[in-house]
Amino acid sequence: MLLPSLICMLALSIEDIRSRRIPRLWVFSGAMVQLIVFVCWSLINADGRRLALCLVLALLSAAIQFLMAVIRPGMLGFGDVTCTAATGLAVGWLGLLPVLMWWCFMGILGLTAIGVAVLRMRHNTPGTTRQTQIPFAPVIASAAVLSCVIDAMSLLAV
């Protein structure tokens, strides 16, 4: 059900690590394919509430990420905001609790990535400068996968 988002997140993460950019066309394409899957499921099951919830949670997540990017320019780019919107669509499909877990994991993994970057700069690792950017798409994707796996495990435990 979430395979389009997983494939898109993997591709975006690799591209972000490789080039420090997130192609918006990839984000849009992945989000549209995932949305088509959700719309089909909603039509087959005659249930639009879940679709509405995931759309609201995705937009809210993107809005929060956008505010963070505006408040602290240079830390997050617009690609990270769009990646959050697309990923939020998938995580939002699972409900509010997985979205909250996702945000917690993004915070933990994001701070870990910053800590690793600072340590690399302190030890003068070749290729690091004061301007070294941290690819955030892998953080967004990893946090999403973690929250989805934990959500799936909690469903199996019931």
Cite the ranges covered by each PLM segment.
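A membrane-topology feature that recognizes alpha-helical transmembrane segments
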Residues: 1-158
